[in-house]
Structure formats: structure tokens, C-alpha cells
């Protein structure tokens, strides 16, 4: 939810350009708890909004309405910045520089080009940095406070994941069979009832195990009746909307209907589906290693040489990898298991370790590898493909639920903070505490 990462450079430039102009004695526009909103803040942001609206061809409300909206935005920023100070939240220079580099990249600029752009618009780089720092602070406060108010139950994730899994996209192809119980052009109620009763009976028979094709041949008025009602493959978006709506959440083997249309009652069977399941398969590795950590008692060269000697002994058959690991490995988590790391995604490992591991063949032992932990001797025991479709679907469902609840809760939280704060707007005769 780091919205500050997507700031438009022009907005920040315009918002601060006004500060560079000569100012008369600045006025306090509002008192916000222990802070203030200055008139120059409002004027600067007002100019920014107008300029950006003009550049994008958008309409803006009248100045009075716009000023009110801007003032409310600045009041909320002020409240959150004061909260950040009380909570001890700070933005390091390193994090700030990374954020600015990201903004430059998003605007297809180098940092040097950004600095030049800022200077051309009359804004110092230091002023720009502080504006971004404020954006990051308010975002951090909001994220911290709102996150703790969000509860997502496992049942919610399961339900949404199942719903998403059953959702059929317009590009999904379905293999359908169809039975049509016809109605005359202007049917009487008795005819409608009789046709509906027959359709319901057929559905019950099919669900009870009766052969769909045989019932289609015997009862359907559809042109494909003699083929057992088989319609073949087709995309959902190509079907009549009456069918598509009911098939939106269908799954393989499902009987859908009866569906009433102008010509009769329809019964559909989903024989098969393709293009709906996007299986997510990941590679997992089973590896083991021996770790030596350089220290005052063991240099890098000594650690490397010791592992080379160990590898030679293992390859010659004099000893096993597990035995050496138990004797010399300095990884307490795996040494007593003979260096076994178990099945895991290679992405969890240190990049240098991972890269060396993924170059190995099954059973192969690496040369000594240096990582941020020390020196490793690595053996790839085995690899496997694991279906992570269900896990990925649940992760996506969780993110969707979180984002939905965050958006709702953030608005509620901001309204609560605004109501709880002491705010006095100083606007001539309209000055009043809120």
C-alpha cells in the first residue's frame, strides 16, 4: 500500500514551486493539535492541482470548494505527521534515496535528469526530498495503524479462493451437451408447467446417474439431439448470455438448469473445460551442505581448502557427505542431519548458494561456494515439481481481501483521527474550532 512510490513527479514539483517565490508574511490557515497549516501550503497545492488539471484536460471545482478540499488534505497530513513523531517513526536517508530513485525510474529519468528537471522548475532537490519524506511518513503511519485493525479469517480466504477457482473467464472453452424441452409459440400455463415438470424430472434422472446422451436423444428438440445433445467446444463469451450467466461459476461435470427461454427449457452439462486452470508449478530442491565460517582461527583460504579436501574424500568413496557434515559443518540446524536441508524452494537460499545449487545435476557436489554465511560444499540430492496452484490462489484471495478491507478501514480510520483532533480553521469570520 505504498502509494508514495507512484507519486507523479510533476505534482510534487508544482506543489513546491510556489514556495520558491517571494512571500509576504505567511499566515496560519489552521491550527491542528500542536501544529499548523500555513496559507502558503494551501496556495502551493492549489497551484499544483490547477496546473496538473490543465495539463491533463480535467475540470476542477471552483476555488472555494478546491481550497476546502486542499485544506482538509493538509490537515490530515499534519495529523499523521504528528502521529509519526509521537510513534518515533522515521525515514532513513537510505530508504528515502531508494524511493526517489524508484520515482525517477517510473518517470523514465535518471537521478541526474530528475535533478535537472527540479532545478528548471525552480525547486531545490533538498525541498523535494523533504516532501517525499513527508509522503513516506504519512503512508507509514497509516499502514501501521490500519493494518492492526484488519482481521481476515481463514474461512474468508477459503471461500474467496474457491469462488475465484470456480470463476470461468470469457476465454475459457467449455465442452457442453444440451437438452431442449420445447414450448409452443404462445404456450398455455398448462403447457409451461408440463414442460418444466419434464425438465426437472430429466435433471433429477441425470443427477441420479441416467445417461445424458440417451435422454437427449429421447427428449430434446435441439438440432444436436441425435448426437446425444453434444454441442462440442466453444468459448463462454460466444454462448447466449442466458447460458453464459449460469455457466459463469460452473465446473466440470456440473448439470445446469433448467433454464427458461422463449423457446423452452434448457438443460446443460459441462463435459469438460480447458483454459480455465492456470496451474502454477514450482521447482523444489532437496539439498545438503557443509558450512565453514571464516574466523580468526580459520581464514577464507583455509576454509576453502578444507572443503576441497572434504569433497575429494567424498568423491573417492572414503567417506560420505553425511559423515563429513556431522564432523565439520558449522550449521547447527543441519549438521546433525548429515547436512540435510530438506525440500524447499531454491529462492529461500542466499543468491550465491542458490545459483551454485541450481547448476548441479542430481547427486553432484559443488566446488566450495562463498555466500554471506561463509563457505559451503553443496550437494543436490533431488528436484521435484510441486503444484502450488491452490496456495497461489489462496495467496491471491488473501491479497484481494486485505486490499479491499484496507481501503475501507483506512477511510474509517482517517475520519476517526480527524474527528479526534483539535482543529481550528482561521478563515476570517469563519474561524472556528472543530
Curated annotation (Swiss-Prot):
Main location class: periplasm
Domain of life: Bacteria
Residues making up the signal peptide according to the UniProt record: 1-20
Enzyme class: isomerase
Matching Gene3D superfamilies: 3.10.50.40, Porin chaperone SurA, peptide-binding domain
A GO term from the CC aspect: outer membrane-bounded periplasmic space
One Gene Ontology term from the biological process aspect of the record: Gram-negative-bacterium-type cell outer membrane assembly
Catalytic activity from the UniProt record: [protein]-peptidylproline (omega=180) = [protein]-peptidylproline (omega=0)
Domain PpiC residue range list: 171-272, 282-382
Example of a GO MF term: peptide binding
Subcellular location: Periplasm
E.C. code: 5.2.1.8
InterPro entries on file: OMP_Chaperone_SurA, PPIase_dom_sf, PPIase_PpiC, PPIase_SurA, SurA_N, Trigger_fact/SurA_dom_sf
Pfam families: Rotamase, Rotamase_3, SurA_N
Alphabetized UniProt keyword annotations: Chaperone, Isomerase, Periplasm, Repeat, Rotamase, Signal
Disulphide bridges, residue numbers: none
HAMAP family listed in its UniProt record: Chaperone_SurA
Function: Chaperone involved in the correct folding and assembly of outer membrane proteins. Recognizes specific patterns of aromatic residues and the orientation of their side chains, which are found more frequently in integral outer membrane proteins. May act in both early periplasmic and late outer membrane-associated steps of protein maturation.
Comment field on protein domains: The PPIase activity resides only in the second parvulin domain. The N-terminal region and the C-terminal tail are necessary and sufficient for the chaperone activity of SurA. The PPIase activity is dispensable for SurA to function as a chaperone. The N-terminal region and the C-terminal tail are also required for porin recognition.
Protein name, UniProt field: Chaperone SurA
Source organism of this protein record: Yersinia pestis
Amino acid at each position: 500500500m505504498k502509494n508514495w512510490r507512484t507519486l507523479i513527479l510533476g505534482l510534487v514539483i508544482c506543489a513546491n514551486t510556489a514556495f520558491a517565490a517571494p512571500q509576504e508574511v505567511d499566515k496560519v490557515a489552521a491550527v491542528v493539535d500542536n501544529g499548523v497549516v500555513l496559507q502558503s501550503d494551501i496556495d502551493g497545492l492549489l497551484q499544483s492541482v490547477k496546473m496538473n488539471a490543465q495539463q491533463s484536460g480535467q475540470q476542477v471545482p471552483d476555488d472555494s470548494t478546491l481550497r476546502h478540499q486542499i485544506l482538509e488534505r493538509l490537515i490530515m497530513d499534519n495529523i499523521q505527521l504528528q502521529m509519526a513523531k509521537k510513534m518515533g517513526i522515521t525515514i532513513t536517508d537510505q530508504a528515502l534515496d531508494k524511493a526517489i530513485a524508484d520515482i525517477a525510474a517510473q518517470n523514465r529519468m535518471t537521478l541526474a535528469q530528475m535533478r535537472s528537471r527540479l532545478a528548471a522548475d525552480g525547486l531545490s532537490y533538498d525541498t523535494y526530498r523533504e516532501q517525499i519524506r513527508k509522503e513516506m511518513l504519512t503512508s507509514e503511519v497509516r499502514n501501521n495503524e490500519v493494518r492492526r485493525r484488519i482481521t481476515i479469517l481463514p474461512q474468508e480466504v477459503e471461500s474467496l479462493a474457491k469462488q475465484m477457482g470456480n470463476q470461468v473467464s470469457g476465454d475459457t472453452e467449455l465442452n457442453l451437451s444440451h437438452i431442449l424441452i420445447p414450448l409452443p409459440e404462445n404456450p398455455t400455463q398448462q403447457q409451461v408447467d408440463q414442460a418444466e415438470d419434464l425438465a426437472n424430472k430429466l435433471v433429477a434422472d441425470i443427477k441420479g446417474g441416467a445417461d445424458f446422451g440417451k435422454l437427449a436423444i429421447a427428449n430434446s428438440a435441439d438440432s444436436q439431439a441425435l448426437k446425444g445433445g453434444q454441442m462440442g467446444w466453444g468459448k463462454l463469451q460466444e454462448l447466449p448470455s442466458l447460458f453464459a450467466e449460469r455457466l459463469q461459476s460452473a465446473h466440470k461435470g456440473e448439470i445446469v438448469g433448467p433454464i427458461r427461454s422463449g423457446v423452452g427449457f434448457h438443460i446443460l452439462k459441462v463435459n469438460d473445460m480447458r483454459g480455465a486452470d492456470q496451474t502454477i508449478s514450482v521447482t523444489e530442491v532437496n539439498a545438503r551442505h557443509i558450512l565453514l565460517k571464516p574466523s580468526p582461527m580459520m581464514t577464507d583460504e583455509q576454509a576453502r581448502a578444507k572443503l576441497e579436501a572434504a569433497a575429494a574424500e567424498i568423491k573417492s568413496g572414503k567417506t560420505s557427505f553425511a559423515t563429513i557434515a556431522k564432523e565439520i559443518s558449522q550449521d547447527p540446524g543441519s549438521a546433525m542431519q548429515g547436512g540435510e536441508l530438506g525440500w524447499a524452494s531454491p529462492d529461500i537460499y542466499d543468491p550465491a548458494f542458490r545459483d551454485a545449487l541450481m547448476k548441479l545435476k542430481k547427486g553432484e557436489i559443488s566446488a566450495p561456494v562463498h555466500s554471506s554465511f561463509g563457505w559451503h560444499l553443496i550437494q543436490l540430492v533431488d528436484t521435484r515439481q510441486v503444484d502450488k496452484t491452490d496456495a497461489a490462489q489462496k495467496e491471491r484471495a488473501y491479497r484481494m481481501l486485505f486490499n479491499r478491507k484496507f481501503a475501507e478501514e483506512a477511510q474509517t480510520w482517517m475520519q476517526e483521527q480527524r474527528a479526534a483532533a483539535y482543529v481550528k480553521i482561521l478563515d476570517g469570520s469563519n474561524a472556528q474550532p472543530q
